[in-house]
Amino acid sequence: MKRKLKWIAVALVAGFALLQLTNPSRTNPLVVRDLMAANPPPPPIAAMLHAACYDCHSSETRWPWYSHVAPMSWLIAHDVTEGRQHLNLSVWPGDDPVRAVKLLDKMSDAIGNGEMPLDKYTKLHADARLTEVQRKELTDWLDGESARLKSGVGK
């Protein structure tokens, strides 16, 4: 019985080691035009956006140590890829106010409804947890930027 457990343990360790050879790409593509460059927020709003949104929705992802360990590396790379596909704050449509308004409204709705940031993210990133007051401040800013763009008023 002990011999069988030993072989099982060796096989599991070897399998885990082999998994490490298949790490996905963890890249941060070039920032084209950032939301905060196009629509500079006040410092507290900028800090909230960076903490709660930028790891999954920008080219400024902070890759934690566990993003280098399979199978977590696959899950994190998938989540970041999916997040960037839905909304990439590093590729902001500054020259397309109609699209920018849609994205700002989508962000405001997701944050205001508590859909974002995702619970699975905030469990490991306490700085990304938003209080109700912070959610209100953030959605007020997003709604204000949306209204400003709708009215065609520049900064």
Regions found by a protein language model. Give the residues of each.
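Hydrophobic membrane-insertion alpha-helices, especially the h-region
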Residues: K6-N23
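Extracytoplasmic electron-transfer domains, predominantly the class I c-type cytochrome c fold
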Residues: W74-L124
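Electrostatic cytochrome c docking/interface patches
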Residues: N28-L49
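A charge-rich, low-complexity, intrinsically flexible signal that marks solvent-exposed coils, linkers
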Residues: N28-V32, H86, I111, L149
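Acidic helix-start/capping segments at beta-turn-to-alpha-helix junctions
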Residues: W63-H78
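C-terminal capping alpha-helices of c-type cytochrome domains
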Residues: G114-E115, T122-V153
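The canonical Cys-X-X-Cys-His
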Residues: L49-T61, M116, L138
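Extracytoplasmic/secreted proteins, especially bacterial periplasmic and envelope-associated proteins
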Residues: P44, M48, P71, L75, ...
